[in-house]
């Protein structure tokens, strides 16, 4: 079954709470202060079963101007709205402000309800009806049905239920199969259970035992118990009013305005890119003006950066970047409201384009074009642009979040885009990583050039060190993605991978006849020299070799296991080194030994033995203890 949330809106004391009670039998005024003053201060909630059996959740919002923040916390989760106007007063200031908010948030399904019709004459009611129609002209409620009721006598209540039923039937349900998003509007503690949060489930399904997180606090938790309208349930679906008992979190750590989410779904941010409309009649908005920001149940102070102008006038729209004073979570296409810093008045609203953008400089044509494309583009075009702008690629689930698409829709779009050659999908640890095909091909061209140059310059080496290649071209790429990229090119037959090196497919070290003879002569020289090997400089002189050429030959012999590099000056033949280790091991069997004793045992000199012992210390074969050494390895 699909669940729809219906909310009230309208001026204080216009009968919203009484209307909800007439529809549902539930008095949503729950605070003592509300009972005494006769006005709603906090949000009220009640379930409603319609004639068709369809389930609605009714949200009763405060009408008093001082409680507009509570109203904003409730209106964000509405699928339908009832704009309530009292027949004895007509359209009032908060009627107009609530209507402006509904219009800015684009809550397109709604009903206009004129209440208290038992208090007025027919001709007066006709005037109020006309006044209301004039007020909603040009807004999302311009063509909304109008129902006249009396909660006291019950007149019109049955018709209102039928109208709600008809509207609910054509209202798209919220996505129950997606990721969980529940903006929190209440936090409290229940003895024996602990922390409980409540809110309207915007998307997804929560089941008892599900792992969740609270953002922007970054708290990990689990759904211990669930209630929907006071009934304990095993799962709650999008569109329902839910109370979630959270495991492992103190009540003081969670706040109204936070969001309960599928782990990794939304990222806290201090910046938001958006399109914003300033209301007609609002004072001009200057660059970096301070404002109150409202999205879902969250409220934050921030500043508006006008990206294409210095001042925004009433009725105008502009691309902006919001700089928040505390972290918030948002998704693309979320709608928000701004109120002026002082006096606090609703000045406009807009839509999120990028929930985690980089910092922008103003008056940058490429930034403005990019944001406009994202604002107007199809899901596929938006997804393609997001991937294009992420030069190092991004995880497909992150792409879904940034594009405000379901995981299922994102996967289908990516597969279609990959088949069309727009995107390359890389398998990374049983997941998908999306890279623009243009970028993927540019990477391969850069790697090809680098390896061709390396093989030409160092024909004796098996390949370029993996980490060196990464530092040159892929330093910003996560290690797991870089590894997957190399493995993909290896599977495609483009590269050959060794433990620490990478080479072009088919490459093998090549030698000239002269080099082959030099390699044999070098091996012989080090084998014969045994425990008194020549220095690097001596070898270069005796073979008349350039130092860089000699270094390449010696490195090759080291890689082949013929020689061992002791330090920058000395190389030892592996056989000679093994024999020396046995001599040292026998020497140490009688106790710690010094440099002179090792020198005598090897029949060599300090010039050769000291570097040898320092090397053996490095490889953990020996350990120095004062002026002596002991053997600690095999």
Curated annotation (Swiss-Prot):
The text of the family note is:
Belongs to the TRAFAC class translation factor GTPase superfamily. Classic translation factor GTPase family. SelB subfamily.
- Places the protein is found: Cytoplasm
Give the span(s) annotated as G2: 38-42
Q: Name one GO biological process term.
A: selenocysteine incorporation
For region G5, the annotated ranges are 150-152
In its UniProt record, a GO molecular function of this protein is:
GTPase activity
**A Gene Ontology cellular-component term:** cytosol
Q: Among its keywords, does the record have Mitochondrion?
A: no
Give the top-rank taxon of the lineage listed in the UniProt record for this protein. Bacteria
- InterPro entries the UniProt entry points to: EF-Tu_GTPase, EFTu-like_2, Elong_fac_SelB-wing-hlx_typ-1, Elong_fac_SelB-wing-hlx_typ-2, P-loop_NTPase, SelB_WHD4, Small_GTP-bd, T_Tr_GTP-bd_dom
Report keywords, A-Z: Cytoplasm, GTP-binding, Nucleotide-binding, Protein biosynthesis
Q: Per the record, which residues fall in region G4? A: 115-118
Q: Where is this region: G3?
A: 60-63
Q: Where is this region: G1?
A: 10-17
Residues engaged in binding GTP:
10-17, 60-64, 115-118
UniProt-recorded name of the protein? Selenocysteine-specific elongation factor
**tr-type G domain residues:** 1-173
| Role of this protein | Translation factor necessary for the incorporation of selenocysteine into proteins. It probably replaces EF-Tu for the insertion of selenocysteine directed by the UGA codon. SelB binds GTP and GDP.
């Amino acid at each position: 079954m699909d669940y729809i949330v219906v909310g009230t809106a309208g001026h204080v004391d216009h009968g919203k709470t009484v209307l909800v009670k007439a529809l549902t039998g539930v008095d949503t005024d729950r605070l003592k202060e509300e009972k005494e003053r006769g006005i709603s201060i906090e949000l009220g909630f009640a379930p409603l079963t319609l004639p068709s059996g369809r389930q609605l959740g009714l949200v009763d919002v405060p009408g008093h101007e001082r409680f507009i923040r509570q109203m904003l916390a409730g209106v964000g989760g509405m699928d339908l709205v009832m704009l309530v106007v009292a027949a004895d007063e007509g359209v009032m200031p908060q009627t107009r402000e609530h209507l402006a908010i509904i219009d800015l948030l684009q809550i397109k399904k709604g009903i206009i309800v004129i209440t208290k019709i038992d208090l007025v004459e027919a001709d007066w009611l006709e005037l109020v009806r006309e006044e209301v129609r004039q007020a909603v002209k040009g807004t999302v409620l311009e063509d909304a049905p109008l129902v006249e009721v009396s909660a006291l006598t019950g007149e019109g209540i049955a018709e209102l239920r039928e109208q709600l039923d008809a509207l609910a039937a054509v209202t798209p349900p919220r996505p129950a199969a997606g990721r969980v998003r529940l903006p929190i509007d209440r936090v409290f503690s229940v003895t024996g259970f602990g922390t409980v949060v409540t809110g309207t489930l915007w998307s997804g399904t929560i089941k008892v035992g599900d792992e969740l997180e609270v953002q922007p606090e970054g708290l990990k938790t689990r759904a211990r118990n669930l209630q929907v309208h006071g009934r304990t349930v095993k799962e709650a679906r999008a569109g329902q009013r839910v109370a979630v008992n959270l495991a492992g979190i103190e009540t003081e750590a969670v706040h109204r305005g936070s969001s309960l989410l599928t782990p990794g779904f939304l990222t806290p941010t201090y910046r938001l890119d958006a399109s914003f409309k300033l209301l007609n009649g609002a004072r001009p908005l200057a660059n970096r003006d301070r404002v109150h920001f409202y999205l879902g149940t969250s409220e934050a102070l921030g500043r508006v950066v006008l990206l294409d102008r210095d001042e925004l006038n009433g009725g105008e729209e502009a691309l902006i970047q919001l700089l928040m004073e505390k972290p918030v979570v948002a998704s693309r296409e979320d709608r928000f409201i701004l109120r002026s810093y002082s006096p606090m008045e609703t000045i406009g609203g807009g839509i999120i384009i990028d929930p985690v953008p980089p910092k922008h400089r103003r008056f940058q044509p490429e930034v403005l074009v990019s944001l406009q494309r994202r604002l107007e583009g199809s899901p596929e075009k938006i997804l393609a642009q997001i991937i294009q702008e992420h030069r190092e690629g991004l995880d497909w689930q992150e792409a879904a979040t940034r594009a405000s698409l379901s995981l299922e829709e994102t996967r289908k779009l990516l597969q279609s885009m990959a088949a069309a050659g727009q995107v390359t999908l890389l398998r990374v640890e049983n997941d998908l990583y999306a890279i623009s095909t243009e970028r993927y091909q540019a990477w391969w061209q850069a790697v090809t050039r680098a390896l061709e140059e390396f093989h030409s310059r160092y024909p004796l080496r098996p390949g370029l060190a993996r980490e060196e290649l990464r530092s040159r071209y892929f330093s910003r790429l996560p290690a797991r993605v870089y590894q997957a990229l190399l493995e993909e090119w290896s599977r495609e037959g483009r590269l050959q991978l060794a433990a620490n090196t990478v080479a072009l497919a088919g490459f093998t070290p090549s030698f000239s006849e002269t080099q082959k003879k030099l390699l044999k002569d070098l091996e012989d020289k080090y084998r014969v020299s045994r425990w008194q090997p020549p220095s690097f400089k001596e070898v270069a002189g005796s073979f008349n070799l350039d130092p860089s050429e000699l270094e390449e030959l010696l490195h090759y012999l080291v890689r082949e296991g013929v020689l061992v590099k002791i330090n920058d000056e000395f190389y030892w033949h592996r056989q000679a080194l093994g024999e020396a280790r046995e001599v040292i091991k026998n020497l140490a069997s009688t106790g710690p030994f010094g440099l002179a004793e090792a020198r005598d045992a090897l029949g060599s000199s300090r010039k050769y033995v000291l570097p040898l012992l320092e090397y053996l210390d490095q490889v953990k074969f020996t350990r120095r203890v004062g002026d002596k050494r002991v053997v600690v390895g095999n």
